[in-house]
């Protein structure tokens, strides 16, 4: 028998989450963001469940080609654009929409030999200060691009740094309005948080990512608990060992947990080599045989320990949900001082994945 840990992906939840995005932004088209191998879920596993989307957005050329090879004929947006001028040959071949955010890309587009014009997303820096042109340069750059034979349809895009806050986009929106002055253009501004909470930023295309997979852009499950969004990934395993501790006995590396009284603990086949966060402290929520309990002690490479006090019936082979439908990935991430995005993306290759 194989080691009992596995990740299961609920494709119906993925479809429902896309439907909820459409309800949240009924007048916009949807770029489903599948970067980082669909946030760790696997593009090849999940793309067809998102077949009702208007387009896919990602980073890697290899992932874009995978979508084309699997039969996706709709738009694909390359969120960081092309990294080298020679990439434009493949962008042309596979009909990819490219972000343009830097001066060197303008020259590369001008000089490229393309069979047909490429659609362009011109990125404005609205305060994130990662990629994009400053607002006072956008009109000039837009006009440069518009004059190029290699450029097809154009859209203005940006990315919000603080859309999870009620007033988090006001400054960015002001900079975007400055950038768009004098332009009649399509816009794509909204990430997951803005899609849910800032309808004034929806415009023509929204770009949901984390909410498609059923986690919160704020890192707090309670913020999306009433939206109908459902977790797509469940990471589960089983108890493979049971120990009964005496008062004062300790658990795991460094002995960081000490039993106050006699206590049963279960040893679960899951550790940081599987993608479970090593820094998850004692008290991180976990579900054992349908009962909510907690981890105890230090997470090891291949194992972790859980308190069996609330579930005395548990023993060898008892199922454990590490995150999923009941134990939200946001709650595990918050306990470990990180975000659900990271845990999804960190799922290890050695963990078997099934779709349901």
UniProtKB/Swiss-Prot annotation:
Residue ranges spanning the membrane: these are none
Annotated residues for binding of substrate? 130, 301
Question: Which residues in this protein are found as N6-(pyridoxal phosphate)lysine?
Answer: 35
Q: Name one GO biological process term.
A: D-alanine biosynthetic process
Cofactor(s) this protein cannot do without: pyridoxal 5'-phosphate
Q: Name one GO molecular function term.
A: alanine racemase activity
Reactions catalysed according to its record: L-alanine = D-alanine
Q: Which residues form the signal peptide?
A: none
Which residues catalyse the reaction? 35, 253
Entries under PROSITE patterns matching the protein: ALANINE_RACEMASE (PS00395)
The record's EC number reads 5.1.1.1
Q: Which family does it belong to?
A: Belongs to the alanine racemase family.
NCBIfam families referenced in this protein's UniProt entry, alphabetically: alr, PRK03646.1
- What is the protein name given in its UniProt record? Alanine racemase, catabolic
Q: What is the lineage of its organism?
A: Bacteria, Pseudomonadati, Pseudomonadota, Gammaproteobacteria, Enterobacterales
What's the gene? dadX
